[in-house]
Amino acid sequence: MPRYSKRSKERLASCDQRLQDLFNEVIKHIDCSILEGNRSKERQNKLYDEGKTKVRYPNGRHNSNPSKACDVTPYPVDWEDRERQTLFAGFVLGMARSMGISIRWGGDWDMDFQVMDNRFDDFPHFEVRG
């Protein structure tokens, strides 16, 4: 069974309990890495300046404590494999639904099951709703 690294565990611990519950279940089935949980002001604004996020601090879901968002990708990481990211997200979304956790994925912001209609794709991004 896959396990999180120490770093992934630390990042996940900075997240909302619902995200912790969800991704602690996901890791039992699919090997994945927690790339980011809570973000500092400096980190959020740096990512904004690099065009990797659309909002400055404190307007991001990563900026609350605990974080309402986390960035997670299947392991090993392959940024070029869009299909793998989408398949992983489908598993996560299904798992969340079965657990009664409402989330939104950065590969389908409007959650209409159309992944080609986004102006900004953020495939590793998952956030709790409500």
Regions found by a protein language model. Give the residues of each.
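Glycine-rich, flexible loop/turn motifs
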Residues: 8, 43, 122
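A general structural signal for well-ordered alpha-helical packing
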Residues: 19-23, 44-45, 69, 89
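Phosphate-binding glycine-rich loops and adjacent basic patches that engage nucleotide phosphates
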Residues: 6-9, 50-57
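Active-site acidic/histidine clusters and adjacent loop/turn architecture
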Residues: 1-33
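Extended, low-complexity, intrinsically disordered C-terminal regulatory tails
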Residues: 23-54, 98, 106-108
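Catalytic cores and adjacent binding grooves of peptidoglycan-active enzymes
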Residues: 13, 59-130
